[in-house]
Every structure is written in structure tokens, then in C-alpha cells.
From Swiss-Prot:
GO terms for molecular function: ATP binding; ATP hydrolysis activity; DNA binding. PANTHER family: SPORULATION PROTEIN RELATED (PTHR22683), TYPE VII SECRETION SYSTEM PROTEIN ESSC (PTHR22683:SF1). InterPro entries: AAA+_ATPase, EccCb-like_Actinobacteria, FtsK/SpoIIIE/SftA, FtsK_dom, P-loop_NTPase. This is ESX-1 secretion system protein EccCb1. It comes from Mycobacterium tuberculosis (strain ATCC 25618 / H37Rv). It is found in: Cytoplasm. One of its GO terms (biological process) is protein secretion by the type VII secretion system. Residues 65-259, 359-545 form the FtsK domain.
Length: 591
């Protein structure tokens, strides 16, 4: 039995033949920008070039074209501002940008340092070899260090450009790629500071706003870029906003705030990822995934897989963000102190902490500014710091060069000063009667050192009219001493001598409870030292405990201080020294 031949109508035959034609009818309308394109497809379709990052699809209706869109950060557009209402896709754009750069550049050429005060999405990029660190609002010290590192890179580049006569960042990039050039040793390429959530940044870190402005204004010339996202453009002051040469705008809460064009009102609501470019064209930002899926579903898993994929292709790593240690021992801060054979100036350069700005030691110049004040709440580290600084002074000076007198009512400074470095009589005072007697005797001896009126400048500088050791009066818990004085001003005999302290070899180191510190700066003794510009450490405390228009006291981890000195204001981690071992008496034997 034979099969019957298929019967087809003329219409069916003609339609089949037309469907195989090579030329097709002109499509009047391109498909709407609905679904995001994955990053692997964007990169495959993009025109690759250095410092260009593929970010999405741009619709150009006049050219009847939908093509890959990206940013070129090699020139004036290297700083980027991203504006848009909440949940419009700003953080996803930042993820896409970093992943796009990481997929097309080496960790030697681009590095990212992120401050995430938005939705927390940047933390998923932390394991990229191109990311030197991600800090959030729960890590204020790290936030400060991220900005400080960027400033340090810019300052170092500025010095390098001058030293090696580099005329532009473009020339620097070429020289850095040449292994025979000195600048090839620079571990940083083009570095990007990303701040996701600008209002939160200026609200919680107001002191850093000016530093970010400096980076935005000067950084591009040295390969340092700033990328900022904000829900409202008005949150960005003009002195920052004007330096953001590239702007990307999502749907705004108020279209009148647009920095590009009012066509942003045409962005559909509830369509995350839709934006407008500087060219005034509509965009669909891509998704940071490499699995070919045109969706933002399960994005965390896709990002994690992409990060792992990129990390497996590189052995280099962006320089990590260095942070202040929770504790720095004195022997780490001051491993090789100069000895007694050094000159006076060297011996009285005393290390008092590690700077947050560049992680180098901060010093108290006690040869010219002989005093040090330490204010802080209970358990903030006041006594430990005083102990460590006393040890640093003793390491530099022999007993013939310095002697200590202690006011130590709580016996917190046991073993802080070796017996050889203590004054002979009245060296350790644990009550008011003992202290008053010792201070009066000390004042009598120091008055003999006051300079005669006919000394020359050279004689004043060399202190040739007297000989002997400097005296350090180390006072722990000033507030307790004041309370025990019964209304009498403690240290009154020494107060008139403080203006001449540098001339007569007198140094005072005072610790005080933060709640009493402001009051202490008003008295004739501590107040005289504070008023003369003595370096002052503000450890942990409450803002209202020390009102000031120049800085804000706040809670800090033990040993961390805000240092106010003639050199400026900065955060330091003060030195730590192990407390003396407690010796317990053996229990009496039975019988």
C-alpha cells in the first residue's frame, strides 16, 4: 500500500519559499529595552579597548540601532556620578562596572576600593583580585583608611611625576608597562574609589567629604578615579558634582533634578536597570553574570560564580587596604629607639602612636613642646598609654638624663618606670599629703633653673645656665587627684613654671577621665599645658563630654585616639605595653 502524496495549497508553498529568503522586511521598531543582557554577551559584542568598561545596551532611535554601551575612563570622563531613586539599579550598575573591568583588565592595571553605604551589594565583589577592599558603615576605621589610601596614592604619584618628569597619566601608563622603567614597580594602576550611597557617607563621615572632593578634583591627572552613587543629585555639592565628568541617570524621584535631560521621565516605573546616558539615549544596564541568563534572578549566586571564574584567571592581587591594628605593642612601634648617646632633640622625639593616614609612627616633640595630655573614658587605655610612653622615654634617656615623679593614686603605673629613673625622694605619691610635699620640693629646685634675663639666644637654646636631668611629672587620673585635694588646687606651686618648662627641663604627662577633661583644661595646671598647645590624645568618650567646634569626641576602641597637636589633627593607635604581672601570695600552710 503506497502513501498518498502530501497535498499542499499554493498559499502554503509560497509562504514556505518566502520564509527562506535571505533578505527580510525592514523592522520599523526595535524590541523594547526590557530584559538585561548578561555581561558575557556585552563583552563579546563590545569593541575592546583599554579602560573601557562595557555596561549595557543603548538604544539610538535615529540610527535605528541598539548596541553595546560602555564608559571610557581614560580621559576627562574618568570620574562617574550615578543618580537615581532607590531600587532603580544603581548598586547593580556598580557591580556590573567592577565585574566588566575585572573581566577585561588585569589586577595590575585596575584596582577598586569600595565604600558600601547602599544596599550591601559591593561586598559580593570582595574576593575579586581587582578589589583591594570593601568597607561598610560598621567599619568606620576601614572607611577612613580607604580614603586615606587613595590620598596616599595620589600624593605618591604627584611626587613620582615630578621626580621622573612624567608629563601626563597617559605617559605614566606607558612607562609603567615597561619593566625597564623605575615606575614599573608601582603596585597601583588606575585606582577607583567607589562610594555607594553618598548621603550616608557625608552624614556619617563628614570629615572625609573634603578629601573626596580633592580626589575628584585632582585625582584624574594621576590615575585616581572617583565613582559616586546618590539617590538625589542635590545631595552632591557642586564642588563635587562638577568634577564627575560622566553621569548616568536612572529614574529620579523628582525629574526636575535631572543632570542630563528630562527624557528620564520616560523611564518606565518598576523597571530596574533602565537609565539615560550622557548622550541622552535610553539604556538597559547589563547584569553582572557570565552564565548567559537575561535576568537579575539569583544574581548573588551568579556574581559569586563570576568572581570565582575571574579570580581563577589571575595570580596578581590589588594591594589590600591596610587598617590600624587593634593593638600595637611599644616594641613594634619603636623597635630600635635611639640611646642615651643621641643628642637631646633625638632623645625627646617620643613615639606616641601609629597614624591612620599612612600607618607611620606619630611623634611627640617633647624637646620643644614638653607636655602630653591623655583624655579618655574608663577602659579606654589611658594608663597603659602613659606606661608605654614612660618606657619609651626611659629607653632613650639614662638616669643621668631624666628622672620621674609619679602621682599614682590607683597604683596603675607599677613598674612603668625603673627604679633607676625615679627621683630620689618623693618619687611615687599615692595620696595628697605625699604629693603636696613632693611638688613643693620639686618647685623649689626647678625655680633655680629659671633663665636669667641677660642670656643670649644661643645660651637659651643650649640651656647652659644649669646642668642635670630633665624631670617628668607623670600624673595618672588627674580627676582623682583633684577630688582628693579637698578644694585646694593641686600642683599649684608648679603652675607658674609651666610657661618656662622647655627651658628648665620639666615635662608633664597627665591622664584624665573624659567626663572631667573639659573642666581640667580650665584649671591653672592642666589648662596651662593645654593652652600652650600640648599634644592631646582624645580616646573613647561621648560627644557632650568635651564640646568642641574643631573635632568630635566619640566612642573608640581601646588605644585609639584622636590626636590634636601643633602638627595637626589625626587618628592614631597609641602604643600598648603588657601590664605588670600580678603576684599572688601563697596561702598559709595548714598548722
Amino acid at each position: 500500500m503506497t502513501a498518498e502524496p502530501e497535498v499542499r495549497t499554493l498559499r502554503e508553498v509560497v509562504l514556505d519559499q518566502l520564509g527562506t529568503a535571505e533578505s527580510r522586511a525592514y523592522k520599523m521598531w526595535l524590541p523594547p529595552l526590557t530584559n538585561p543582557v548578561p555581561l558575557n554577551e556585552l563583552i563579546a559584542r563590545d569593541r575592546r579597548q583599554p579602560l573601557r568598561f562595557a555596561l549595557g545596551i543603548m538604544d539610538e532611535p535615529r540610527r535605528h540601532l541598539q548596541d553595546v554601551w560602555g564608559v571610557d575612563v581614560s580621559g576627562a570622563g574618568g570620574n562617574i556620578g550615578i543618580g537615581g531613586a532607590p531600587q532603580t539599579g544603581k548598586s547593580t550598575l556598580l557591580q556590573t562596572m567592577v565585574m566588566s573591568a575585572a573581566a577585561t583588565h588585569s589586577p595590575r592595571n585596575v584596582q577598586f576600593y569600595c565604600i558600601d553605604l547602599g544596599g550591601g551589594g559591593l561586598i559580593y565583589l570582595e574576593n575579586l583580585p581587582h578589589v583591594g577592599g570593601v568597607a561598610n558603615r560598621s567599619e568606620p576605621d576601614k572607611v577612613n583608611r580607604v580614603v586615606a589610601e587613595m590620598q596616599a596614592v595620589m600624593r605618591q604619584r604627584e611626587t613620582t611625576f615630578k621626580e621622573h618628569r612624567v608629563g601626563s597619566i597617559g605617559m605614566y601608563r606607558q612607562l609603567r608597562d615597561d619593566p625597564s622603567q623605575p615606575v614599573a614597580s608601582d603596585p597601583y594602576g588606575d585606582v577607583f574609589l567607589i562610594i555607594d550611597g553618598w548621603p550616608g557617607f557625608v552624614g556619617e563621615f563628614p570629615d572625609l567629604e573634603g578629601q573626596v572632593q580633592d580626589l575628584a578634583a585632582q585625582g584624574l591627572a594621576f590615575g585616581v578615579h572617583v565613582i559616586i552613587s546618590t539617590p538625589r543629585w542635590t545631595e552632591l555639592k557642586s564642588r563635587v558634582r562638577d568634577y564627575l565628568g560622566t553621569k548616568i541617570e536612572f529614574r529620579l524621584g523628582d525629574v526636575n533634578e535631572t543632570q542630563i535631560d528630562r527624557i528620564t521621565r520616560e523611564i518606565p516605573a518598576n523597571r530596574p536597570g533602565r537609565a539615560v546616558s550622557m548622550e541622552k539615549h535610553h539604556l538597559m544596564i547589563g547584569v553582572p553574570r557570565f552564565d548567559g541568563v537575561h535576568s537579575a534572578d539569583n544574581l548573588v549566586e551568579a556574581i559569586t560564580a563570576g568572581v570565582t571564574q575571574i579570580a581563577s584567571q589571575h595570580t596578581e592581587q590589588a594591594p589590600p587596604v591596610r587598617v590600624l591594628p587593634e593593638r600595637i605593642h611599644l616594641h613594634e612601634l619603636d623597635p630600635n629607639p635611639p640611646g642615651p648617646e643621641s643628642d637631646y632633640r633625638t632623645r625627646w622625639e617620643i613615639p606616641i602612636g601609629l597614624r591612620e593616614t599612612d600607618l607611620t609612627p606619630a611623634h611627640c616633640h617633647m624637646h620643644t613642646n614638653p607636655h602630653l595630655l591623655i583624655f579618655g573614658a574608663a577602659k579606654s587605655g589611658k594608663t597603659t598609654i602613659a606606661h608605654a610612653i614612660a618606657r619609651a622615654i626611659c629607653a632613650r634617656n639614662s638616669p643621668q638624663q631624666v628622672r620621674f615623679m609619679l602621682a599614682d593614686y590607683r597604683s596603675g603605673l607599677l613598674d612603668a618606670v625603673p627604679d633607676t629613673h625615679l627621683l630620689g625622694a618623693g618619687a611615687i605619691n599615692r595620696n595628697s599629703a605625699s604629693l603636696d610635699e613632693a611638688v613643693q620640693a620639686l618647685a623649689v629646685n626647678l625655680k633655680k633653673r629659671l633663665p636669667p634675663t641677660d642670656l643670649t639666644t644661643a645660651q637659651l637654646r643650649s640651656r647652659s645656665w644649669w646642668s642635670g636631668f630633665d624631670v617628668v611629672l607623670l600624673v595618672d587620673d588627674w580627676h582623682m587627684i583633684v577630688g582628693a585635694a579637698g578644694g585646694m588646687p593641686p600642683m599649684a606651686p608648679l603652675a607658674p613654671l609651666l610657661p618656662a618648662a622647655a627651658d628648665i627641663g620639666l615635662h608633664i604627662i597627665v591622664t584624665c577621665q573624659m567626663s572631667q577633661a573639659y573642666k581640667a583644661t580650665m584649671d591653672k595646671f592642666v589648662g596651662a599645658a593645654f593652652g600652650s598647645g600640648a599634644p592631646t590624645m582624645f580616646l573613647s568618650g561621648e560627644k557632650q563630654e568635651f564640646p568642641s567646634s574643631e573635632f568630635k569626641v566619640k566612642r573608640r576602641p581601646p588605644g585609639q585616639a584622636f590626636l590634636v597637636s601643633p602638627d595637626g589633627k589625626e587618628v592614631i593607635q597609641a602604643p600598648y605595653i603588657e601590664p605588670p604581672e600580678e603576684v599572688f601570695a601563697a596561702p598559709p600552710s595548714a598548722g
